[in-house]
C-alpha cells in the first residue's frame, strides 16, 4: 500500500464516524428533551426507558409544588393558582345585621 492509499482510507473513515455519531447525538438530545414530569391530584412518575415500576406519590400541598413546576415557570408566564374546592366546602359568607 502506498501513502496515498492509506490517506484515502483514513479520509473515508472520519466522515463515516461523523455520519454515525451526529445523528445519534441528535436522537439522544431529542429524547432527553421530551422527558417531562406531569403533576396532578395523585402524581405518577415513571421512567419510560429503564423498566422501573411506576412510583405513586401523594398530591402536593401547594399549587405547582414540584421543582419541575418551578423551573417551568421561568420560561412560561405565571398564572394565579386556581384550585377547585370539593363539593360542600364553601366558605360561609358572614352577613351583617
Curated annotation (Swiss-Prot):
Residues 1-33 form the signal peptide. This is Secreted transmembrane peptide 4. Brassicaceae-specific phytocytokine (plant endogenous peptide released into the apoplast) perceived by MIK2 in a BAK1/SERK3 and SERK4 coreceptors-dependent manner, that modulates various physiological and antimicrobial processes including growth prevention and reactive oxygen species (ROS) response regulation. Prevents general growth and development. It is found in: Cell membrane; Secreted, Extracellular space, Apoplast. Residues 75-97 are annotated as: Disordered. A motif (SxS motif essential for MIK2 binding) lies at residues 60-62. Transmembrane segments: none annotated. A motif (SCOOP motif) lies at residues 54-67. The keyword Membrane applies. Interacts with MIK2 (via extracellular leucine-rich repeat domain); this interaction triggers the formation of complex between MIK2 and the BAK1/SERK3 and SERK4 coreceptors, and subsequent BAK1 activation by phosphorylation. It comes from Arabidopsis thaliana. Induction: Induced by drought, salt stress, jasmonate (MeJA), ethylene (ET) and salicylic acid (SA), mainly in shoots. The lineage of its organism: Eukaryota, Viridiplantae, Streptophyta, Embryophyta, Tracheophyta.
Amino acid at each position: 500500500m502506498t501513502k496515498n492509499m492509506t490517506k484515502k482510507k483514513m479520509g473515508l473513515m472520519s466522515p463515516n464516524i461523523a455520519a454515525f455519531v451526529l445523528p445519534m447525538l441528535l436522537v439522544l438530545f431529542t429524547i432527553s428533551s421530551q422527558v417531562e414530569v406531569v403533576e396532578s391530584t395523585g402524581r405518577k412518575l415513571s421512567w419510560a426507558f429503564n423498566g422501573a415500576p411506576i412510583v405513586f406519590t401523594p398530591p402536593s400541598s401547594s399549587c405547582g409544588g414540584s421543582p419541575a413546576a418551578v423551573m417551568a415557570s421561568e420560561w412560561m408566564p405565571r398564572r394565579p393558582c386556581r384550585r377547585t374546592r370539593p363539593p360542600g366546602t364553601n366558605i360561609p359568607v358572614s352577613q351583617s345585621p
